[in-house]
A protein has these predicted regions:
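Active-site-proximal loop/short-helix segments
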Residues: 132-143, 223, 227-253, 280-307
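N-terminal basic, low-complexity leaders that serve as flexible interaction/assembly modules and, when applicable
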Residues: 6, 26-138, 143, 196-199, ...
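Structural preference for beta-strand elements that scaffold enzyme active sites
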Residues: 71, 77, 125-127, 225-227, ...
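Active-site-proximal, glycine-rich beta->alpha crossover segments in alpha/beta enzymes
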Residues: 144-277
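Alpha-helix-loop-beta-strand connector modules within alpha/beta enzyme cores
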Residues: 181-197, 221, 302-329, 368-370, ...
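Catalytic-face loop-and-helix region of soluble metabolic enzyme cores
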Residues: 321-390
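Active-site beta-loop-alpha junctions enriched in small/polar residues
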Residues: 79-81, 131, 229-233, 294-296, ...
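Alpha/beta enzyme core
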Residues: 246-289, 301, 309, 313-321, ...
Length: 390
């Protein structure tokens, strides 16, 4: 969506080291004081008679930042939308009494959980409530979330034969294929409440606090974007090979080196699967998306560059083909990883519009590393950096 944006000039990224740490957010490519507005006279040029502005309404802060522009406020959201800090979330899960993956495939439940942080805190985006294991389930893979453990696979995939059997499956072909429609319905329900450039959000039946949160979130744009997400190919592959969470991902890294052909088939399948999962959310109305790589930090830069990055690029390419009915365009994409300070340049080169970082790297250092990785591309928006201990 086009908008009015006054020009600014970029200053040295070295000033970023004085930037304060913010919460989970996307910031423009030059954070804090490193973007300065041109003279106010230019504002008059963008105004019509009697001071009325010309052109369409402004974009939400998240979309402004992802486009590399400096928004009026730093967009903030819950990185993990299933926020156990929210009493209404805990109460809802207790009442529903269903396993995590089943909750993700219940449109009413998924939509309600997605909306809770926006209503309570007025955050700038609603991360769609789901799990990175959902696309595996929707391809007929036996997987469950065990309390205190995490994702557990019924049958790990560790041989060429097992990989061959797995990659014959397709997104939406499994016994839970109707779950694809459930995801689409849940996203549409969220968009109805959060609004879009075409229609304001529905507020009937909500508490005063919830309406206030939604109004703050919508801001001057008048609507709040839904953020789609999916697990990166390496993270999905690591779970598939290990069978459960692992500290060192030894089995996955062994397959990567001992059987590169099977690794290629596995990663290609994971990339297309998670890309289509994200695309499904976008086609239903999500306006932006994030590829989430929980385990890439366990890899060396060389291993990541040669055996992982091409597949992350493929997943992003698949996701980028989807057009959001909310904005009428492809969703901007964030590539986030944990413990990936040494990989930031490679993550950017995979093709995302912004790169996410965890608390183990300063924002200024991340911005400089990303700029050095591709000087011709210019500065890159950066997201994240809040220490979970806070």
């Amino acid at each position: 969506m086009s908008h009015i944006q006054f020009p600014y000039r970029r200053e040295s990224t070295r000033r970023q080291h004085s930037s304060p740490d913010n919460g989970d957010f996307v910031t423009g490519s030059s954070h804090n004081d490193s973007m300065t507005s041109e003279p106010a006279a230019q504002a008059a040029e963008a105004a019509g008679p009697a001071g009325t502005t010309t052109g369409p309404a402004p974009s939400p802060a998240l979309l402004e930042a992802l486009a590399g522009r400096r928004p009026a406020r730093t967009p903030v959201w819950f990185m993990r939308q299933a926020g156990r800090s929210l009493p209404e979330y805990r109460a809802l899960r207790a009442r529903a009494g269903v396993p995590m993956l089943d909750a993700c495939l219940d449109p009413a439940l998924a939509a309600e959980v997605t909306l809770q942080p926006v209503r309570r805190h007025g955050v700038d985006a609603a991360v769609f409530f789901s799990d990175i294991m959902v696309p595996l389930r929707l391809a007929g893979v036996g997987v469950r979330i065990e309390e205190g453990v995490g994702p557990v696979l019924d049958a790990p995939v560790r041989s060429g034969r097992e990989v061959g059997e797995l990659v014959a499956r397709r997104f939406g072909d499994g016994p839970d294929a109707e779950g694809v429609g459930a995801i689409e319905e849940a996203v549409r329900r969220v968009v109805v409440e959060l609004g879009s450039p075409q229609a304001p959000g529905v507020r009937e039946g909500l508490s005063e606090r919830a309406r206030a949160g939604l109004e703050h979130s919508a801001g001057s744009a008048g609507w709040t974007p839904v953020l789609a997400f999916g697990g990166a190919p390496f993270t999905l592959a690591a779970y598939l090979v290990e069978g459960r969470p692992s500290r060192d991902h030894l089995a996955a890294r062994t397959l990567m080196r001992a059987d590169p052909d099977s690794w290629d088939r596995l990663m290609t399948w994971c990339a297309r699967l998670t890309g289509e999962f994200i695309a499904t959310q976008v086609r239903a109305g999500a306006a932006a998306a994030q590829l989430f790589d929980s385990w890439a930090g366990s890899l060396s830069p060389r291993a990541y560059r040669e055996r992982v990055a091409p597949y992350s690029a493929l997943a992003l390419d698949v996701a980028r083909q989807a057009v959001s009915p909310t904005t009428g365009k492809a969703a901007p994409l964030i590539h986030f990883g944990t413990g990936t300070a040494r990989l930031l340049g490679l993550m950017r080169q995979a093709g995302a519009d912004a790169v996410g970082v965890d608390e183990r790297i300063e924002l200024g250092e991340a911005i400089e590393a990303l700029a050095e990785a591709d000087p011709q591309a210019g500065a890159c928006p950066v997201q994240g950096n809040l220490d979970p201990a806070l």
